[in-house]
């Protein structure tokens, strides 16, 4: 899931030229790349990933059958040398690379793929990645004609099937190290909670460069756990880390002025920031608040009362656009351009609230029972743009008599609340979309899904509109015509705009910071923006990370 104070963020010290190792015309193999995670990884099991930190590790360590190139947006052979999908979209056959081994030396063959797919689709596992493959009732069928081939048949057609395998890291069926045995360019060598994750070069990795030299070039990647974005940019400027995958907008502008070669804006991203209300029936807060949150008019009024243009202008310094739905306008084909763009209108918000029994009394909004409208929004600690957005939303909603409190939590605690204990009222977070095909959002929109955040894991849809989204999601996932899929997805976006389960705020630009010492970088609009091609990254001949004197 992965996926970001009402004062302008300031640095503790004045910006100056970054103390970064100078890149040479040709890099060298070896060395250790340094960058930061913004929290603890929640899991090392690639099938259970739902947070950005764990996704970073999955991307760098997981071997996949098919890789979606973040720059060309083309599908490339991975562990599979070739594949073929049946005309009805239900069956896919993979021809696997022979002679490969996991990082611990365990041989790789079709049994590992079969084992992974069975685990992925096991309903007891509740895999967010597995949700993307659920297109119909019934079980998948798997055949392994040989050690180097596998045939997977789904109960119904799966649209965009090939692209989905970019998210499926293959597990070993036999290694005693279980999910820690990997087929990607790096493996997890060390983890100190609260400090760092160390990845080392997988010497069994199958890829080679054009000259036949084994990849990756790097010896290791150190991922320091750093929640505070201010400290992260200071460490980048001192040369202690080599890149920042997602850079805050105001820090981007300052870095661009001081070191243009290190600041990269790849343009509008697919990512979104949004707020939602907890509608889980068993949540431990008063029933009258649950009634507010379940009321469509209440959610729509909140949406009307938030000034998205100000969020884009002030928080993101113009490096973002107001968002009104689940698909970014940067995703040209799938974006529904007919969606209404609700403009900031506090008077209209009050009229809408009055229709469902709320009254504005002496500058305070009360419900029909006289309860003051007040709620708490949780967000991730150390993420200044999110903290600043909550602070600005506090100001906006105070104009219609609503009191908003803010609580910031470290990321593991926040994830625990929104996925396990449901001990919260509202949350501001974001989703990172790694691919263009919206089928990757199945784990958000199906009412039974893990990331259906406002009310996850429903045994049956709680509302008629959620049932309709379920039907449309299943229909588009089974359709073989892009025209039919587009029509279904347009309708899903329309329902989301009408019901506002997520109140979308902004789509930000893909901004990153990359040291000139990093050779081979090619920032992408798709995540991971700065290290999608980590296997071919090199460091300049000066590998020192010390600050300049």
Task: Describe the residue ranges of each PLM region.
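Aromatic- and charge-enriched surface segment that lines or borders ligand/interaction sites
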Residues: 81-126, 151, 232-235, 291-294
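N-terminal lobe/hinge region of extracytoplasmic solute-binding protein
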Residues: 36-87, 118
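Alpha-helical secondary-structure segments
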Residues: 34, 109-116, 147-153, 185, ...
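Detector for C-terminal structural segments
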Residues: 192-196, 265-273, 301-341, 345-350, ...
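Ligand-site clamp/hinge motif
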Residues: 205-254, 394, 403-405, 410
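Surface-exposed binding/hinge segments that line
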Residues: 25, 95, 129-175, 190-192
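Extracellular/periplasmic solute-recognition and catalytic clefts
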Residues: 120-123, 127, 141-143, 189-200, ...
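Gly/Pro-rich hinge or "lid" segments in bacterial periplasmic/extracellular proteins
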Residues: 69-71, 163-222, 230-231, 335, ...
